[in-house]
């Protein structure tokens, strides 16, 4: 009887329609295992994975004094259970967590001290190990972070405690991320010699000249950073949003192609260029004189009026350490207002030592330039590139104020 049941299951799973229904409910990692069973299963698994285009977010926080023994297992199971095969992971952790050693789960009791030591890992090393090899890890640590629960019902701001925030993005056709790292000291030397860092940055950029750059995310782990870098990026990538801030540490899985260092943790500045014709990026600055939830809502209303499709969007919040609870007198003010106004859009970010960004608020329907774009003019006649003629054109335009203190930058990305 038992053998008959097993045989029946084998027969049933040879029916493509039923196999497809079963595989549709499996996470991506299990789908990859099933794809090796036979040619039919391989084709079905491939089709199922191609149809999955939704992003996934993850947040975990620990109060002071809580034990971290289970965090490594939580991270590993989160990646294991992802329905998508992630192409990019944006991750922010508090510096308190970055400095911790996590205990890795094991079935065996380690008696030898050396073996026990091998079962410890930093959060950055652990995530590198469990991510698919093709997934880009773009991460940083700071004194505070912002994260959204998997069900999108709650966004939390954490300052001075242990917390981790992740956003897993699937591969989308024609949407690409290019990273390049900048040694700000080499840049400063170049400025001293030539009074221009344009040639230096152009040589470092990994973005092909024919790509349509919609945003450059800018993360620096040094308090000293020549402001000319940000403005040069604006000139290189005309009509692209520049957004980011100053963090404590950079974490990435990508080797630096222009440096002997194998990890960008040794670099001073990490730039992430987001490209794609169907990508729309908008940003808004919550200035230092905003003190109430009602005022925050009025500012975010400008972002809401851009009419980006919320369910196909994600957003970043780059805030000053001086904001948050200390500024408003209560927790989660800005993130709660965002959650109220954009209930279908995940939000993540950090509290840093300085913010980078500007108002870029074109409406989505017609892409017409809006007067709220901080004097930043668009030129719809051609795409972004680093070609000399294009850069010279960008240098003639008035540039917005890019560097801020005691503000919050909200940057929203949509794939339409």
What are these regions (language model features)?
Residues 2-315, 320-416:
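Cofactor- and metal-binding active-site motifs of prokaryotic enzymes
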């Amino acid at each position: 009887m038992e053998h008959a049941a097993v045989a029946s299951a084998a027969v049933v799973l040879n029916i493509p329609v039923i196999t497809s229904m079963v595989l549709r409910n499996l996470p991506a990692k299990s789908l990859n295992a099933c794809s090796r069973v036979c040619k039919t299963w391989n084709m079905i698994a491939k089709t199922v994975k191609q149809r999955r285009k939704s992003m996934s977010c993850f947040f975990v926080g620990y109060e002071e004094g809580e034990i971290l023994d289970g965090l490594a297992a939580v991270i590993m199971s989160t990646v294991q259970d992802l329905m998508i095969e992630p192409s990019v992971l944006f991750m922010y952790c508090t510096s308190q967590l970055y400095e911790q050693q996590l205990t890795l789960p094991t079935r065996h009791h380690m008696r030898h001290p050396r073996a026990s030591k091998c079962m410890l890992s930093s959060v950055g090393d652990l995530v590198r190990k469990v991510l698919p090899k093709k997934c880009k890890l773009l991460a940083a640590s700071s004194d505070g972070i912002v994260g959204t629960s998997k069900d999108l019902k709650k966004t939390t701001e954490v300052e001075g405690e242990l917390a981790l925030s992740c956003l897993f993005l699937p591969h989308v056709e024609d949407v690409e991320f290019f990273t390049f790292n900048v040694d700000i000291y080499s840049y400063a030397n170049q400025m001293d010699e030539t009074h221009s860092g344009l040639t230096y940055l152009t040589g470092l950029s990994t973005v092909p000249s024919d790509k349509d750059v919609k945003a450059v995310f800018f993360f620096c782990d040094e308090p000293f950073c020549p402001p000319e870098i940000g403005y040069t990026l604006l000139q290189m990538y005309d009509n692209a949003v520049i957004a980011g801030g100053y963090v404590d540490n950079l974490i990435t899985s990508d080797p630096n192609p222009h440096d002997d260092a194998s990890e960008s943790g040794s670099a001073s500045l990490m730039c992430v260029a987001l490209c794609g014709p169907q990508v729309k990026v908008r940003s808004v600055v919550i200035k230092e004189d905003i003190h109430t939830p009602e005022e925050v809502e009025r500012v975010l209303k400008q972002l809401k009026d851009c009419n980006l499709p919320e369910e196909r969007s994600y957003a970043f919040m780059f805030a000053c350490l001086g904001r948050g609870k200390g500024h408003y007198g209560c927790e989660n003010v800005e993130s709660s207002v965002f959650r109220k106004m954009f209930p279908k859009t995940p939000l993540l970010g950090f509290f840093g030592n300085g913010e980078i960004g500007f108002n870029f608020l074109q409406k989505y329907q017609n892409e017409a330039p809006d007067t709220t774009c901080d004097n930043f003019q668009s030129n719809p006649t051609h795409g972004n590139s680093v070609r000399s003629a294009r850069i010279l054109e960008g240098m003639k335009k008035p540039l917005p104020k890019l560097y801020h203190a005691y503000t919050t930058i909200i940057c929203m990305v949509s794939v339409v």
